[in-house]
Design a protein with these regions (language model features):
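Enzymes that bind and transform nitrogen-containing heteroaromatic metabolites
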Residues: 1-168
């Protein structure tokens, strides 16, 4: 399956100054780890360059969409027709899920490939210089499950994309 996983607020906040726009929440980090561990993670160069993110993300197959060289060993570089390459990853690794981490432009560009979206909805609004168009993203998405965090400040939701299209 091809999925996306990200956290946002009602304004579509996604990032600020090259990193997360809020302090990491242990429960949200556990949700991320639970779903992506031993899977494939795909991200754009700006997400990869986040100074707070370990490189590579441990116990995952890391793929970076970029035209620049990647100096970290054991990281796959995707460039050119990255959507086709993401689909090819499914063939190479049939027993793994692919999680597109971001940025928002890559998530929106790949929306027609995404089977499920794992979205952490955060209460309140944070300052950001990077946003995802939540209204556009949610078109065709149907909620399959949702649960609040222990502190009730987050809501962990899974959406199924009913408008999915596979080009291969």
């Amino acid at each position: 399956m091809i999925c996306t996983i990200f956290a946002t607020d009602q304004m579509g906040t996604f990032g600020n100054r090259g990193t997360l726009p809020w302090k990491p929440n242990p429960e949200d980090m556990a949700w991320f780890r639970e779903h992506t561990l031993d899977q494939i993670v795909v991200m754009g160069r700006k997400t990869w360059d986040d100074p707070k993110m370990p490189k590579p993300l441990p116990s995952r197959i890391n793929c970076v969409i970029t035209n620049k060289p990647i100096k970290t060993p054991n990281v796959r570089k995707l460039s050119g027709d990255y959507k086709k390459q993401i689909c090819e990853l499914q063939i190479l690794f049939p027993n793994k899920n692919i999680f597109i981490l971001g940025g928002p432009d890559i998530i929106m560009d790949c929306k027609d490939l995404i089977d499920y979206a794992y979205v952490t909805h955060r209460k309140g609004a944070a300052f950001s210089d990077v946003r995802i168009d939540l209204k556009a993203f949610m078109v065709g998405m149907r909620i399959t499950s949702s649960r609040p965090s222990t502190d009730k400040m987050l809501n962990f939701s899974i959406y199924k994309n009913v408008d999915i299209f596979r080009p291969l």
